[in-house]
Amino acid sequence: FIRNLTLRQEGNTLVLFQFVEKHGKILHDMINDKDSERKVFFVYGGTDTDQRENIRRITEGENDAIIVASYGTFSTGINIKNLHNIIFASPTKSRIRNLQSIGRGLRRNDTKVSCNLYDIGDDMSWKAKKNYTLHHMVERIKIYNEEDFSYKLIKVDL
């Protein structure tokens, strides 16, 4: 689902994930294997600073690049004005991390007037087991309401 959502987006897309091996690398490979025409970058803690800067520079000049990056490396401290879409591919409830991550897409440039955020929340409910993924989504919705963000919830049956 996340791969297909990413590939359907127009413009540059940032996909943020939590765990490098369990999420990020697999997602990067799935996206890259499906579309070899687009530039698809993978950024995590092991990506050196010069390479990150090169990816940032390339993305500023592109209109169809995909960056699959860990929250730790791209949720704060990176300035790419030419981002059109952000996808939260892993659940988190941190207010600061969420707002900083959204801020990646709010940088203005001459051609961009908006940025789309896709915040994915899975309902992994089963019997009486606590569903942290859904709980984190509810916490993020509270943040969006407090910040007066415009959003809509879409249920997707898989």
Where are these regions (language model features)?
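Short coil/turn segments at beta-strand junctions that form active-site/ligand-binding loops
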Residues: 11-12, 19, 38-39, 63-65
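Conserved strand-helix element at the start of the C-terminal RecA-like helicase core
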Residues: 1-30, 144
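Long, largely alpha-helical accessory region at the distal end of helicase-like NTP-driven motors
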Residues: 12, 149-158
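Amphipathic alpha-helical protein-protein interaction surfaces
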Residues: 11, 36, 79-82
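Conserved RecA-like helicase motor-core motifs
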Residues: 14, 28, 32-54
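Conserved beta-strand scaffold positions in the cores of enzyme catalytic domains, especially
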Residues: 40-42, 117, 151-153
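Conserved RecA-like P-loop NTPase helicase motor core
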Residues: 44-147
